[in-house]
């Protein structure tokens, strides 16, 4: 992998946030795909996503920006999202590389921002 690209991927600021809009529930996932091994980890993991989405009714939009990470965690997140009865819309806001590309494929609809 290109060293410059690797450095850019590592600089993606971790963020997990949510909001309810007139179009449904929006979950922003930014950062590394990996299990949370420590209490203060901010990784994108199935446990965090389950905590955010388990009681959501209606459409779910996931805004995704990640350089990837643990492929097995990515597969677990994919399987979790596919198991939901909700319509899942994935919006790739900048980057969905490696394990994050697996997560992106879980959407019933996938939108890519210009330049992503």
Positions of predicted regions on the chain:
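N-terminal organellar transit peptides
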Residues: 1-99, 105-116
């Amino acid at each position: 992998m290109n060293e410059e690209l690797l450095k850019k991927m590592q600089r993606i600021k971790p963020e997990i946030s949510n909001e309810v809009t007139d179009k449904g529930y929006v979950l922003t996932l930014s950062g590394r795909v990996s299990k949370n091994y420590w209490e203060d980890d901010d990784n994108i993991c199935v446990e965090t996503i389950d905590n955010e989405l388990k009681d959501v009714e209606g459409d779910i939009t996931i805004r995704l920006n990640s350089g990837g990470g643990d492929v097995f965690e990515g597969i677990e997140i994919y399987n979790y999202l596919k198991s939901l009865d909700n319509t899942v819309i994935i919006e790739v806001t900048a980057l969905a590389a490696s394990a994050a590309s697996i997560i992106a494929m879980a959407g019933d609809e996938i939108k890519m921002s210009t330049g992503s």
